[in-house]
Design a protein with these regions (language model features):
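Functionally constrained cores in energy, signaling, and assembly domains
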Residues: 113, 226, 248-251
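Short Pro-Gly-centered flexible turn/kink motifs
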Residues: 233-251
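Short, acidic Gly/Pro/Ser/Thr-rich loop/turn segments
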Residues: 207, 250-251, 255
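An acidic-aromatic substrate-binding cleft motif
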Residues: 242, 256-262
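Short intrinsically disordered coil segments
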Residues: 131-132, 217, 260-262
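Short acidic, Pro/Gly- and aromatic-enriched capping/linker segments at domain boundaries
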Residues: 216-236
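Polysaccharide-binding surfaces and accessory modules of carbohydrate-active proteins
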Residues: 1-214, 229-231
């Protein structure tokens, strides 16, 4: 609460501020990032956190590099990989919707998050959008994505982050030549070895979106998620939907950003 901005004259009672999943009940006035309907009617949930758990989870193997005859060799380490993990559970009891948010920090510094939506009420619950985000500081003023076509894929393009929303959508059922692997926000003129950079990636081989957005009262926000068609995800009572992982990286230049993924 100490980080929330003060109330602005002539605006809402609470000044909008980006979170990992901002909703209208938090005074978010940007693009909708959590869209659900019950029996055809859209719900605007006011979630209350019911549980937070921090733990270290054994998650796969750690690989150690050795050099033999001048060539690197990768071997499984004796100790399993341990990943710091935070799991938060929130619920809107009145509207019958539960949300479980999970965030992991890899040993490289890569952050990844996902959310699970659970229908705890009566009637069918249609999930239209769950777009998770990473708030970024004020020095992130320039957007970098890639575009292209056959024989000219992954061509970089830049533009300033202005008030409003920029999004890069992949709607061909898999990442196409036009798809961007990362959406990066950084200091103006950032490069491979200079400038603070913050990047996001949706770990999904289907339809997806990456976005950058800034409101008049806030700093910027990176976001991403799966693009769902109407009726594609409909939950009966007790059923759940889990989003793809949305990965976030940062660094002094793009090389450091990439190193956290690799």
């Amino acid at each position: 609460d100490a980080l929330r901005p003060q109330r602005v004259s002539g605006a809402l009672d609470y000044t909008a501020w980006p979170s990992v999943l901002p909703t209208q009940s938090e005074s978010w006035i940007g693009a909708k990032r959590f869209e659900i309907r019950r029996d055809g009617r859209e719900l605007f949930c006011k979630f209350a956190v019911t549980d937070i758990k921090a733990e270290t989870v054994e998650d796969g193997n750690v690989y150690e590099m050795t050099v033999k005859n001048g060539y690197p060799q990768w071997n499984v380490a004796s100790e399993p990989k341990r990943t710091p993990t935070i799991t938060a559970t929130a619920e809107d009891v009145e509207q019958g919707v539960k949300l479980i948010w999970t965030c992991e920090i890899d040993v490289s510094g890569l952050v990844r998050q996902q959310a699970t939506v659970i229908n705890t009420g009566d009637g069918l619950l249609e999930v239209g959008k769950v777009e998770l985000g990473f708030p970024v500081p004020a020095d992130a003023t320039e957007i970098l994505t890639t575009t292209g076509h056959h024989l000219r894929e992954r061509s970089p393009q830049r533009q300033p982050l202005t008030v409003g929303r920029f999004e890069k959508v992949s709607m061909t059922g898999r990442p196409d030549f036009d798809a961007t692997l990362l959406l990066s926000l950084g200091e103006t003129g950032f490069g491979f070895t200079r400038g603070n950079v913050y990047s996001a990636h949706v770990a999904c081989s289907g339809n997806s979106v990456l976005s950058a957005e800034r409101l008049p009262y806030t700093t910027g926000m990176l976001g991403g998620g799966e693009m769902l068609f109407g009726g594609e995800i409909t939950l009966a009572g007790g059923e759940e939907y889990t989003t793809p992982w949305v990965c976030g990286s940062f660094g002094e230049g793009l090389n450091e950003v990439a190193s956290r993924f690799h």
